[in-house]
């Protein structure tokens, strides 16, 4: 599907780890800047320095956590591609569930299972939305032959000459006795 433009698996792990670190550091930096700004003493200088101090203290840590998640997810995804010999949405769903479980393993079995469930559900939602979007956007990029384009144009002209709206032409006339 959309994975064909990506790097091969050993490099994909490093690429995903770096991308996840960048996302975590930037997103965590913005969040920590707001948090540090709000929690600093009053005065613009104190608030700006408080926001900057919070960014320096925590954004690297958040980026590191994201990098661990990205590397674990990508390593599991590459392993599944190798063993299953196919690259499909199930790999991402299984990788998300397994990553959630592995990263929560230190907190106990219940937390591990719930994190695995959340990771799998989250990746299933992401993959599902990606499939739906690609399905509906693929039709708009479908090539139309000149003959088919001419036929559609003639049908549209006939509809306009009859005075039938495009909605009625698509769904048919409404039977008023059924109302």
From Swiss-Prot:
The keyword GTP-binding does not apply. One of its GO terms (cellular component) is TIM23 mitochondrial import inner membrane translocase complex. GO terms for biological process: protein import into mitochondrial matrix; protein insertion into mitochondrial inner membrane. Keywords: Membrane, Mitochondrion, Mitochondrion inner membrane, Protein transport, Translocation, Transmembrane, Transmembrane helix, Transport. The chain crosses the membrane at residues 17-37, 61-81, 113-133. The lineage of its organism: Eukaryota, Metazoa, Ecdysozoa, Arthropoda, Hexapoda. This is Probable mitochondrial import inner membrane translocase subunit Tim17 1. It is found in: Mitochondrion inner membrane. It is a multi-pass membrane protein. Belongs to the Tim17/Tim22/Tim23 family. Essential component of the TIM23 complex, a complex that mediates the translocation of transit peptide-containing proteins across the mitochondrial inner membrane. Component of the TIM23 complex at least composed of Tim23, Tim17 (Tim17a1, Tim17a2 or Tim17b1) and a Tim50. The complex interacts with the Tim44 component of the PAM complex.
């Amino acid at each position: 599907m959309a994975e064909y433009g990506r790097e091969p698996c050993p490099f994909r792990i490093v690429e995903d780890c770096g991308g996840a670190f960048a996302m975590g550091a930037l997103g965590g930096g913005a969040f920590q800047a707001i948090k540090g700004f709000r929690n600093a003493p009053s005065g613009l200088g104190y608030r700006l320095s408080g926001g900057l101090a919070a960014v320096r203290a925590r954004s690297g840590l958040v980026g590191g956590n994201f990098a661990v998640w990205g590397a674990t997810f990508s390593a599991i995804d590459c392993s599944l591609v190798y063993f299953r010999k196919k690259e499909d949405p199930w790999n991402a769903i299984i990788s998300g569930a397994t990553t959630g479980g592995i990263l929560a393993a230190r907190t106990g079995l219940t937390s591990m299972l719930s994190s695995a469930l959340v990771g799998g559900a989250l990746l299933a939602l992401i993959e599902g939305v990606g499939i739906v979007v690609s399905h509906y956007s693929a039709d708009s990029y479908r090539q139309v032959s000149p003959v088919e384009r001419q036929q559609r144009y003639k049908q549209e002209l006939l509809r306009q000459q009859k005075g039938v709206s495009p909605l009625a032409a698509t769904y048919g006339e409404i039977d008023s006795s059924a109302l």
